């Protein structure tokens, strides 16, 4: 399926701003390391040996989810907006010297896909819950729609709250259109507070156009996804040791009881 392209239209009631300039395509190897302990190349499709991390992007339609993925995996920026149904990308990175395949699942945010979208949630290690910082409506839906949906299907999966289109915070045309609707960009402090309330791992603002904080978003997703995957293995080990621990505690308690008697 062809990837979504172009700056998405704002989901708010305001008219969208003029399309931003398209940055030149960069060489894949020109951006350096992918954060502490995380490095490697990126690309669509393909696979890699080693462990995998499944990352699902959710959020209202037209907030720029696909633009994040395309910008991250290709170092380019889409020039045309085509609503996404569902799409999969992959990025091979190195974590502590070991290959990790980051599977990126781009989902549709429109209501007509509400019944199909959860089919992508199976075995998800990390959710990137996206809203546009210049769309108060998409921010409101974080708590009203998206967190309940995620918790209903994947109650233990971690969430990173992502504020997209941060490059439009100071865009004059966008601010004028928002003012016509008596609205303003979502305050960063309000987004951070929301992240705390929904118990998200963190809140990160980024821009697919300028790539500001783009790698931080996916680095955080990789780390949180690996931690979640590892934590899912711990209960099994703990359960097998529980009877032994109970017996040891019982023996210790019995010895103390005998001494007191």
Curated annotation (Swiss-Prot):
GO MF annotation terms: GTP binding; GTPase activity; metal ion binding
Q: Does the keyword Ribosomal protein apply?
A: no
Q: Output the superkingdom of the source species.
A: Eukaryota
Q: Which GO terms describe its cellular component?
A: cell projection; focal adhesion; Golgi membrane; plasma membrane; podosome
Q: Which UniProt keywords apply?
A: Cell junction, Cell membrane, Cell projection, Golgi apparatus, GTP-binding, Isopeptide bond, Lipoprotein, Magnesium, Membrane, Metal-binding, Nucleotide-binding, Palmitate, Phosphoprotein, Ubl conjugation
Residue ranges annotated as compositionally biased, kind Low complexity, are 7-16
Q: Where is the composition biased (Gly residues)?
A: 32-48
User: Where exactly is the Glycyl lysine isopeptide (Lys-Gly) (interchain with G-Cter in ubiquitin) cross-link placed along the chain?
Assistant: 180, 251
Region spans: Disordered: 1-48
Which example biological process does GO assign this protein? actin cytoskeleton organization
Lipidation annotated as S-palmitoyl cysteine: which positions?
259
Post-translational modification (record):
Tyrosine phosphorylated by SRC in response to PTK2B/PYK2 activation. Ubiquitinated. 'Lys-48'-linked ubiquitination at Lys-180 and Lys-251 by the ECS(RAB40A) complex leading to its degradation.
Which Gene3D superfamilies does this chain map to?
Answer: P-loop containing nucleotide triphosphate hydrolases
The cellular location(s) given in this protein's UniProt record come to: Cell membrane; Golgi apparatus membrane; Cell junction, Focal adhesion; Cell projection, Podosome
Q: Name one Pfam family in it.
A: Ras
The family database entries (InterPro entries) matched by this protein are listed as: P-loop_NTPase (IPR027417), Small_GTP-bd (IPR005225), Small_GTPase (IPR001806), Small_GTPase_Rho (IPR003578)
Q: Which cofactor does it need?
A: Mg(2+)
Q: Which SUPFAM superfamilies match?
A: P-loop containing nucleoside triphosphate hydrolases
- Tell me the subunit arrangement: Interacts with PAK1. Interacts with PAK3. Interacts with ARHGAP30 in a GTP-independent manner. In its GTP-loaded conformation, interacts with ARHGAP31. Interacts with PTK2B/PYK2. Interacts with PAK4; interaction protects RHOU from ubiquitination and subsequent degradation.
Which family, according to UniProt? Belongs to the small GTPase superfamily. Rho family.
Q: What is this protein called?
A: Rho-related GTP-binding protein RhoU
Query: What organism does the UniProt record list as the source?
Result: Mus musculus (Mouse)
Gene encoding this chain? Rhou
